[in-house]
Amino acid sequence: MDCAEEKAKSLRRQIADTEAELAQLKLQLLSLEEKDTNSKNLEAKTSASEKDDPVTHIENKWPMSLEEYKRYGRQMIVPDIGIKGQLRLKSASILLVGAGGLGCPAAAYIAGAGVGTIGIVDGDIVEESNLHRQILHSTDRVGVNKAGIVKDYDIVLDCTDHPTSRYLISDICVLLQKPLVSASALRTDGQLIVLNNPALPPGDLSGGSCYRCVFPKPPPPEAVTSCGDGGIIGPVVGVMGVLQALEAIKLIASGKLAAVGENDNTSPTPKMNPTTMLLFSTNGSTPFRNVRLKGRRSNCFACGEEAQLALEQMSSGSMDYVLFCGMTHPVKLLSDEERIEARDYDSIRKEKEHLLIDVREKVQFDICNIEGSYNIPFSSFQGSKGSSDHPLSTLTENLNPKTPIYVVCRLGNDSQIVTKKMKDLGLDQKGDRYIGDIKGGLRSWKEQVDGSWPEY
């Protein structure tokens, strides 16, 4: 970002503050004019056009239109906002990365608060299964690209749902010195954190923590669960999105944002609250909890004293976030001979004795399942060494040694892991018994066999 752009952003902020002061002076002047005993004589001299259109004459005295006063009036009378805060909101710009369950409510409330410029970055398309939480979209927009790409904003909201994007967005905010409001939600829980606030240059440990400070190492790939896999309750992600909007509004209205490189020596730097992470749990006895976090880590890769991150790395694409998070390839543990197409399994199941194991969690199995299948959740295989009391041992104890076993899951990933696990336990009888998974899982079952299969 060049110096001219930074100077322009600094000037816009100065204009907003000056307009707020001007509004106060105009209020004082108006009060004096109303008390002036000669006010009637002044009104008599008012031009006919001004008498015909008094609204236009009055509006010229105020920094906002009368419509804006009416729209944001109840917000402006809150002491934490006021006229100055509202003018700051009007001149501010916010970038939302992700227009899904978090981004939709956040965008709605940010726009409703009167933020002047809102950018939305999202390369995904609208899916019908997302409409219960992505409230800006409707069924007639299914398949439409959600948003374009916008840059150069005052605050960034991370409304994505994957570690790779969270690390990427945080790194960019550190390098460009932008505060970041990050949130996540899964099942019945959510978390919220304001990062890089204050947004000081890398190496300045008085700045706010970044995402790498809080999570130096990404979670293992097998531990990452998306809303599509783990499920989400709409109001939960809605709560977190609204809280993101609230944090952004608080930051802007407080006047604590500063342009990159701006150094005002005439006023002390405002004291920032310690970084905390807000934890929300629908089923908890205390739904909201705050966890206090340490500041910037001195050895942080992105913002520490010897930060190794540079804009050139981001521009050139040399920073591989997929590799960093350990997600270099899709799951491919089995050979083609160990996998079977859904249509081929459909033919086999009608003619041959076999065992079909569905490794989805019970809550998903109860939604819909293939007739004759047995449910042994994927979670029961994690850490299991094939003990005698494991459901799999009970199920296969009296099974013919040559009876084939097929494994199915939702998308064809967990089923590969379980198939390999079963072979490692020796259930393939040293190759005498076929054990394989249904390629593509139940999604392929819907595409190739049963078009009426519920897709969730």
Swiss-Prot record:
Reactions catalysed: [molybdopterin-synthase sulfur-carrier protein]-C-terminal Gly-Gly + ATP + H(+) = [molybdopterin-synthase sulfur-carrier protein]-C-terminal Gly-Gly-AMP + diphosphate; [molybdopterin-synthase sulfur-carrier protein]-C-terminal Gly-Gly-AMP + S-sulfanyl-L-cysteinyl-[cysteine desulfurase] + AH2 = [molybdopterin-synthase sulfur-carrier protein]-C-terminal-Gly-aminoethanethioate + L-cysteinyl-[cysteine desulfurase] + A + AMP + 2 H(+)
Cofactor descriptive note: Binds 1 zinc ion per subunit.
CDD domains, sorted: ThiF_MoeB_HesA_family
Subcellular location: Cytoplasm, Cytosol
EC number(s) per entry: 2.7.7.80, 2.8.1.11
Residues bound to ATP: G101, D122, S129, N130, L131, H132, R133, K146, D161, H162
Keywords of the record: ATP-binding, Cytoplasm, Metal-binding, Molybdenum cofactor biosynthesis, Multifunctional enzyme, Nucleotide-binding, Nucleotidyltransferase, Transferase, tRNA processing, Ubl conjugation pathway, Zinc
One Pfam family named in its UniProt record: ThiF
Positions annotated as active site in the UniProt record: C227, C409
Domain Rhodanese: 350-454
GO molecular function, one term: ATP binding
SMART domains: RHOD
Cofactor: Zn(2+)
Disulfide bonds: none
Any single GO CC term annotated in Swiss-Prot or TrEMBL for this entry: cytoplasm
Primary subcellular site in the record, as a coarse category: cytoplasm
Residues bound to Zn(2+): C210, C213, C300, C303
GO biological process: Mo-molybdopterin cofactor biosynthetic process; protein urmylation; tRNA wobble position uridine thiolation
Keyword flag tRNA processing: yes
Superkingdom assignment: Eukaryota
Function: Plays a central role in 2-thiolation of mcm(5)S(2)U at tRNA wobble positions of cytosolic tRNA(Lys), tRNA(Glu) and tRNA(Gln). Also essential during biosynthesis of the molybdenum cofactor. Acts by mediating the C-terminal thiocarboxylation of sulfur carriers urm1 and mocs2a. Its N-terminus first activates urm1 and mocs2a as acyl-adenylates (-COAMP), then the persulfide sulfur on the catalytic cysteine is transferred to urm1 and mocs2a to form thiocarboxylation (-COSH) of their C-terminus.
Family designation: In the N-terminal section; belongs to the HesA/MoeB/ThiF family. UBA4 subfamily.
Protein name: Adenylyltransferase and sulfurtransferase uba4
Organism listed in the record: Sclerotinia sclerotiorum (strain ATCC 18683 / 1980 / Ss-1) (White mold)
Protein encoded by which gene: uba4
